[in-house]
Regions:
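Short acidic donor-binding/metal-coordinating loop in glycosyltransferase active sites
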Residues: 104, 112-115
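Hydrophobic helical membrane-anchoring modules
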Residues: 1-4, 192-267, 277, 302-330, ...
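Acceptor/aglycone-binding surface of glycosyltransferases and processive sugar-polymer synthases
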Residues: 72-101, 118-197, 222-227, 232, ...
Length: 389
């Protein structure tokens, strides 16, 4: 039925109980559809019997890639079992390894816990062959569904995560871990560095996949094993989103972060002014403490978060950038004061607060431009990370 052979990538960690059922269903699918199939199990060194199962019971189309953080002993590979050393743990890095090492042109990613129906793989493949760049097994298109015992907060969590990803894709379920794409599109990816579980969204952004289709599926809650979706993973998703925003919308993302840091500086300023005033300090000292602490706070946050690729290391480098930051802040403050004063004198009916806001906006833009293009100028852009082994 299909022109292209298929590689199925299955990332695992302590999923031994689910693998026989998954392999059985994939085997039936292969026989029924005449599908040329390989299954790559990417295991994060579970030591739960997965290796013994592959060696003794798994069908011949299953290959096991054991990922470890440490180095490997020479000659540790077998015919169907390969060990990969120096690998960070995690679902997303495992998927990237699997996509890189797969043999076939059509690549399918799915979970091992049987929440994704293998019987939908033909629909994904046919949609790819019809011209889609990526096809997602979706819970949220017409015909898609989840088990009835999904609680409100789980549903809300999924919807919020999807809404936060909307600037990158119109797909209804970009969070899905069940999707297919071509090797040729995967190999166009730039700077792959996913965090957490949402590797599909990473590929949509980094492979520039604009033609994304969706096939309805019923998402089944796992019966065996334990869910890996924890609060830690949800926080990792937020970090991942930040990276993607910085990748796709670099200038606007860094400007928004710069503005947020500036807003936090106002809070720091007022806090220290209040504390010093309550301690009985003279007004000039209270005001000075607020200014100095907010400058240091703003610099530290911008150095750490807004311009991470351009920060200098070592005491001398940090002090050099701090001096530049203070200089840029002085230029911005001077512009803010001058413009506000000019507006007040030129338009006497203009409220003072409006003039002040105009000055703040102009000062912030100039301050940001000086910091980005001079103080935190990136001389050597980071090289894209290599994929593969």
């Amino acid at each position: 039925l299909f022109r292209s052979p298929v590689s199925v990538i299955v990332p695992t960690f302590r999923e031994r109980e689910n693998l026989p059922g998954l392999a059985e269903r994939l085997g039936r699918l292969r026989d029924r559809c005449g599908l040329e199939l390989e299954v790559l199990v990417l295991d994060d060194d579970s030591r739960d019997g997965t290796e013994a199962w592959v060696r003794a019971e798994a069908p011949d189309f299953v290959r096991l890639l054991i990922r470890t953080e440490g180095s490997l002993e020479p000659g540790s590979d077998e015919a169907r079992i390969q060990r990969l050393g120096g690998r960070p743990r995690g679902l997303s890095p495992a998927v990237i390894d699997g996509l890189s090492m797969a043999r076939h042109e059509v690549l399918v990613v799915m979970d091992a816990d049987l929440s994704h129906p293998p019987e939908k793989i033909p629909s994904l493949v046919l949609a790819l062959e019809a011209g889609q760049q990526m096809v997602i097994g979706s819970r949220y298109v017409p015909g898609g569904s989840t088990d009835d015992d999904w609680g409100f907060f789980r549903w809300l969590n999924s919807k919020v995560a999807t809404a936060l990803a909307r600037p990158f894709t119109d797909a209804k379920d970009p969070m899905s871990g069940f999707f297919a794409l071509r090797r040729s599109d995967f190999e166009r990816a730039r700077e792959l560095n996913p965090v957490g579980y949402k590797v599909g969204l990473e590929l949509i952004v980094k492979c520039s996949l604009e033609n994304v289709g969706e096939v309805p599926i019923h998402f089944t809650d796992r019966v065996l094993g334990q869910s890996k979706l924890t609060l830690k993973e949800q926080l990792a998703y937020l970090r991942h989103l930040r990276r993607l925003y910085m990748f796709r919308y670099a200038t606007w993302s860094s400007f928004v972060q710069f503005a947020l840091v500036g807003a936090s500086g106002v809070v720091v300023n007022l806090t220290f002014v209040t504390l010093f005033a309550l301690a009985g300090s003279p007004e000039w000292l209270a005001l000075l403490s607020g200014i100095l602490t907010s400058i240091v706070s703003n610099f530290a946050l911008n150095w750490r978060f807004t311009f991470p690729d351009a920060r200098m290391r070592g005491t001398r480098g940090v002090l050099q950038q701090f001096a530049g930051f203070v200089g840029a802040s002085s230029v911005g403050a001077s512009l803010q004061y001058g413009l506000a004063l000019l507006l007040v004198r030129s338009f006497p009916a203009l409220p003072l607060q409006v003039a002040a806001l105009a000055g703040i906006a102009a000062g912030m833009v100039v301050n940001y431009a000086i910091n980005r293009y001079f103080v935190f100028k990136t001389k050597h852009p980071p090289r894209p990370k290599k994929r593969g082994v």
